[in-house]
Amino acid sequence: MLENICINFKKVKEKTPLVHSITNYVTINDCANMLLAYGASPAMVESFDESYDFAKLASCIYINLGTLTREQEQSILMVCISAKNNNIPVVLDPVACGAVPHKIALIEKLFEIGRIDIIKGNIGEIKSLAGYNAKTRGVDSIDNGNDSIDACISLAKKYKCIVAATGVKDIVTDGKRTALIENGSKMLTLITGAGCMVGALTAATAGVEDDKFIATITSILSMNIAAEHTEKEVIGPGSFKVKLIDNIYLLKENHLRKEGKIKWI
């Protein structure tokens, strides 16, 4: 399984997947730079008039609900319809869905009329979508309960998609296979946009890999190992954020192969 992850990582470098992103305004530049550093090609296209047609060109689509506007919402609907019609995978980051019921209604509609292949959120967001009690503070989760794995598996089965929940240990599941990723750095919680950047990387790996379970593990493991490298080189969150992009750029297959800490459940 780890070898498949390394192959997926290498394919991003070889194929330069085009990631069509409709993301939030807080981290849009971070996501674009992270994609470039990883070997992908970012396109931050959110205009309603362009969204359906541009989505046809993408290797994968990344949707982030962090600063949702009315035009973004309409564009997201069109992008998901285009993805369904043109067989383009979609990664969804349901930012703050636990705090904003309208976002949950939108997500239900996206599954109804469009396509979502991967949901990547923090554990609070995932538990909210799965119908579990969740502890959130705005866009942040303060929940790492014992039922986290059950919630992820339940949501994956409900929507027949990959679910990834980030936390102290990151959970990835397709409802049958489940992985716990134990790499990471506490410094990721001290910068804005770490989760958004992981979502963008997930779209890059999913754009070149048929097995979206593997693709999701690849992206999260990449970010976490790069974060471990970065933590050793910096003195605080400001330098950490800048150096993190450098270490994503410098990441090699052997780092994943030798340093990856994954438990298969």
Curated annotation (Swiss-Prot):
SUPFAM superfamilies: Ribokinase-like. It comes from the Bacteria. Its EC number is 2.7.1.50. Pathway: Cofactor biosynthesis; thiamine diphosphate biosynthesis; 4-methyl-5-(2-phosphoethyl)-thiazole from 5-(2-hydroxyethyl)-4-methylthiazole: step 1/1. Its cofactor is Mg(2+). CDD domains: THZ_kinase. Keywords: ATP-binding, Kinase, Magnesium, Metal-binding, Nucleotide-binding, Thiamine biosynthesis, Transferase. One of its GO terms (biological process) is thiamine biosynthetic process. Substrate binds at residues 44, 193. ATP binds at residues 120, 166. Pfam families: HK. GO terms for molecular function: ATP binding; hydroxyethylthiazole kinase activity; magnesium ion binding. It catalyses: 5-(2-hydroxyethyl)-4-methylthiazole + ATP = 4-methyl-5-(2-phosphooxyethyl)-thiazole + ADP + H(+). Catalyzes the phosphorylation of the hydroxyl group of 4-methyl-5-beta-hydroxyethylthiazole (THZ). NCBIfam families: PRK09355.1, thiM. Belongs to the Thz kinase family. This is Hydroxyethylthiazole kinase. It comes from Clostridium novyi (strain NT).
